[in-house]
Regions:
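Active-site pocket-lining/capping segments in soluble small-molecule metabolic enzymes
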Residues: 32-89, 106, 120-127
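A short, amphipathic alpha-helical segment
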Residues: 94, 113-124
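A structural motif corresponding to the C-terminal end of an alpha-helix
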Residues: 7, 88-99
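Active-site-adjacent beta->alpha loops and helix N-cap segments on the catalytic face
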Residues: 16-32, 107-118
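Catalytic beta/alpha-barrel core
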Residues: 10-19, 101-104
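Conserved, mostly hydrophobic/aromatic
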Residues: 4, 8, 39, 100
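Aromatic/hydrophobic pocket-lining residues that form the small-molecule binding cavity
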Residues: 1, 23, 82, 86, ...
Length: 127
């Protein structure tokens, strides 16, 4: 990361993160680089989605507790719970993150738009 900063990087972004503690640990390890670290936020949409990310995508961990929350969920119920999990992540990292990198799952842009509205509401609370 330091090499990227030396070559002009103005921010860094992560893969989707589902554990706030992991992001905060990464932030602590990279905090002296002088650029914002933006966590990837991709709402889960189903149990299958959570399991796939956890088991098949290197570098992405979906904690046991979150996989348990997604158990048996799909379609609208899965998307609702995935948004709730994403909001909780944003709440837990809001004061530390340099912003967020929102990733709409499967082209479901409406989920990212809901998170944008949520983030803007959080920002207004601080004013």
């Amino acid at each position: 990361l330091r090499k990227k900063v030396a070559n002009g990087a103005r921010f860094a972004q992560t893969q989707p993160v589902y554990d706030p503690a992991l992001f905060l640990e990464a932030l602590e390890q990279t905090g002296d680089c002088g650029i914002p670290l933006l966590p990837g936020v991709m709402p889960l949409v189903s149990e299958r989605n959570a399991l796939y990310l956890h088991n098949e995508v290197p570098g992405i961990t979906v904690p046991d507790a979150i996989r348990a929350r997604m158990k048996g969920l799909e379609k609208e119920a899965g998307a609702r719970e995935g948004l709730a999990i994403a909001r909780e992540f944003i709440d837990a990292t809001f004061n530390a993150a340099g912003g967020y990198y929102l990733i709409p799952p499967f082209g479901k842009c409406e989920l990212a738009l809901e998170l944008i509205d949520y983030i803007h509401a959080r920002e207004r609370e601080l004013r």
